[in-house]
Amino acid sequence: MTAIVDIIGREILDSRGNPTVEVDVVLEDGSVGRAAVPSGASTGAHEAVELRDGDKARYLGKGVQKAVEAVNGELFDALGGMDAEQQVQIDQTMIELDGTPNKGRIGANAILGVSLAAAKAAAASYDMPLYRYVGGTSARTLPVPMMNIVNGGVHADNPIDFQEFMIMPVGAPTFADALRCGSEIFHTLKGELKKAGHNTNVGDEGGFAPNLPSADAALDFVMAAIGKAGYKAGDDVMLALDCAATEFFKDGAYVYGGENKTRSRSEQAKYLADLVARYPIVSIEDGMSEDDMDGWKELTDLIGSKCQLVGDDLFVTNVTRLADGIKNGRANSILIKVNQIGTLTETLAAVEMAHKAGYTAVMSHRSGETEDSTIADLAVATNCGQIKTGSLARADRTAKYNQLLRIEQELGAHAHYAGKAALKALR
């Protein structure tokens, strides 16, 4: 009944207008699972490989026909007839077939598309929502959203060196209320930026990209918008940063182009500690460069007890890198991006390892997204309590929020909004 009878890959467009892979997995009983694969702009050097064609005459070299051919040919040949319920076996078969440590031969974009589509097909066969199929009966926690409302770094054409300034509505009683809170602050911020003469166009992830000189200036605007929208910063709403520090780490130092300043490893740690002391910041992602291991340790020792320190480029959803971080006291949280590792099985293993070690986990989108809302279900399935999926604009971002609204409604009285309990610093 759940045997795989067809796997169909195709090239579609992501939210940046670049090609990406979409996969349909068809089962013997007629059930179909569909998954579209996201793509990142600021990518970690240790991520699984996204296979691109490299033909400059077609999509400027960004086509994914080779990955699609692998889906329709090699992967279907290997998986046809296999039971879609056997997720671990399916994923392991693809990993072994690829034969490289980073999925570089077949491509993580091909492998992930099949992996997620197979799980969705199996869920459909049982007439179960994906969050229930993957997470079982205990999957009922709606995550606190990290809403990226100001963009900088490689996500924007402005002087701000940090990539994302986010709000977290931790004081809301439900996910629906949290979403409303975020939306009201987002629109209030737009008005405040406009009033101050700033551009209010949105970036890749739906946040504003004003021409501000520093992180302090961006944080001040966000704080003002929270208050003007009728909420209390530090109680109803907390702040979060994604520094994406790898992007401005050069020759052993942190080079702030927008501020025309260079900070040493220790100065970087102290600067972030100072921001945490002056603003209600409860989470900092990639505050140090991906390979600055001493910097990560210094930052964790300095503020790890009072702030969530999320490893994105540091861990790349990889259990080997995560285990090393846990052992050596680097960071205290992991960002979970399905396409960084390339299979559902490995994604779930990373969340499990983090939770067992007392690390938090944050389910995350990429800057190049689609209308696929799988990560919303996975956030609930894993009870991770936090999701990072952009701003309150652009359909590729709101698709995930809308799916979480549906899940909360479906769970009814059993639904639980993570709120302040999602963050150890607020418990």
Curated annotation (Swiss-Prot):
What does the note accompanying the cofactor annotation read? Binds a second Mg(2+) ion via substrate during catalysis.
Q: Which GO terms describe its cellular component?
A: cell surface; extracellular region; phosphopyruvate hydratase complex
Q: Does the keyword Kinase apply?
A: no
Binding positions ((2R)-2-phosphoglycerate)? Q163, K337, R366, S367, K388
Pathway info: Carbohydrate degradation; glycolysis; pyruvate from D-glyceraldehyde 3-phosphate: step 4/5
Main EC class of this protein?
Answer: lyase
Q: Which of this chain's residues are annotated to bind Mg(2+)?
A: D242, E285, D312
Q: Which cofactor does it need?
A: Mg(2+)
Say what the protein does: Catalyzes the reversible conversion of 2-phosphoglycerate (2-PG) into phosphoenolpyruvate (PEP). It is essential for the degradation of carbohydrates via glycolysis.
Similarity comment text for this entry: Belongs to the enolase family.
- The protein's name is Enolase
Which organism was this protein described from?
Answer: Rhodopseudomonas palustris (strain TIE-1)
This chain is encoded by the gene named: eno
